[in-house]
Amino acid sequence: MELEQLLNSVPEYAKDLKLNMGGVLRQTELTEQQAWGTAVACAIAARNPQLRESVLGEAAKHLNEQALFAAKAAASVMGMNNIFYRFRHLSTNPKYGAMPARLRMQVIAKHGSDPIDFELWCLAVSAMNGCGVCVDSHENVLREKGVSEEAVLAAIRIASTIHGLAAILDVEADPIA
């Protein structure tokens, strides 16, 4: 389903999310690649099949193959890392923090896309997944590389809007809810 068609199916009570989606993808703080890569990574992380397929379909018009690969890779590796590092952060046992991760994360260095864009996508997914350690880490890297706080927040607007839309689409797809 086309993204516009999917957004038009959003119920009236979630109209703000529908309208926000149109706006957050056109924020001037982000390049087109940054915005659509963020949308792809977050739509994958949101785990709603309709939203994921609609965003991927539209994003293919705005991203080259390498950027699309990198956005998918960001969602993939953050899906793993956010759980691992959030556990280490939340656990009161200090031994876990000293133990090695022993998880492959080579795609972080070998995604083939713009490193700042990839970092931004990782940040957005980390925010969705609630990993404070990862959010701080990615935000610090972005700020050190000169990315503005406005651009960081623009990516988070995309993440929050996609997260909200996924929740509504899940509810509307389940007649029991």
UniProtKB/Swiss-Prot annotation:
Disulfide bonds join 131-134. It catalyses: N(6)-[(R)-dihydrolipoyl]-L-lysyl-[lipoyl-carrier protein] + a hydroperoxide = N(6)-[(R)-lipoyl]-L-lysyl-[lipoyl-carrier protein] + an alcohol + H2O. Keywords: Antioxidant, Disulfide bond, Oxidoreductase, Peroxidase, Redox-active center. Its EC number is 1.11.1.28. The active site is at 131 (proton donor), 134 (cysteine sulfenic acid (-soh) intermediate). Antioxidant protein with alkyl hydroperoxidase activity. Required for the reduction of the AhpC active site cysteine residues and for the regeneration of the AhpC enzyme activity. PANTHER family: ALKYL HYDROPEROXIDE REDUCTASE AHPD (PTHR33930:SF7). This is Alkyl hydroperoxide reductase AhpD. The lineage of its organism: Bacteria, Pseudomonadati, Acidobacteriota, Terriglobia, Bryobacterales. The gene is ahpD.
